[in-house]
Amino acid sequence: MRAAREVFSELGYDAATFQAIAIRADLTRPAINHYFSSKRVLYRDVVEQTNAKVIAAGIAKAREATTLLNRISAFFAAAMDAESTDRSAAAFLVTSVLEAQRHPELISEEHDALRSSREFVKWAVDEAIQRGELSTDTDIPAIVEMLVAVMWGMGFY
């Protein structure tokens, strides 16, 4: 999976091939084909696994915190932990957001990293308003999009 994640990140979905992934994984192309009937199936599995490793783990960690700043910080910390063990994870997530614009059929709603992170940030902002951290006249859509842009911008970095 790591080899596939790296190849998809470096080459993009269209240019990635089972052969390139097999070479990176030190396997044969038929070995990969045995487990994944198509590039789309492999890509979706990589998306699902990477989202669970980075986004879902970050959200779970952030839900333990009690303030907006601590929740966003916990999310970043969890993502950085995932990145420190597998440098391809964050790069792939950023690439997957771009690929979803080119190929909407590749991403299921359940495993859409951008949507999941946006929902998390909206929840965290709503909670911050309820707790009085942010004023009730806060422009929720604007602050959510700004925070999501910062999160994903850090992913590009």
Residue ranges and their predicted role:
Residues 3-10, 57, 61, 92, ...:
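Solvent-exposed, amphipathic alpha-helical segments
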Residues 3-41, 45:
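Helix-turn-helix
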Residues 10-14, 65, 86, 131:
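Short coil/turn segments at alpha/beta junctions that flank glycine-rich nucleotide-binding fingerprints
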Residues 45, 56-89, 136, 140-147:
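Hydrophobic alpha-helical connector segments
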Residues 48-54:
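Short, basic, alpha-helical segments at the C-terminal edge of helix-turn-helix-like DNA-binding modules
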Residues 55, 85-91, 104-131, 141-142:
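Amphipathic alpha-helical packing segments from all-alpha helical-bundle domains
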Residues 82-85, 95, 99-102, 123, ...:
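Amphipathic C-terminal alpha-helical segment
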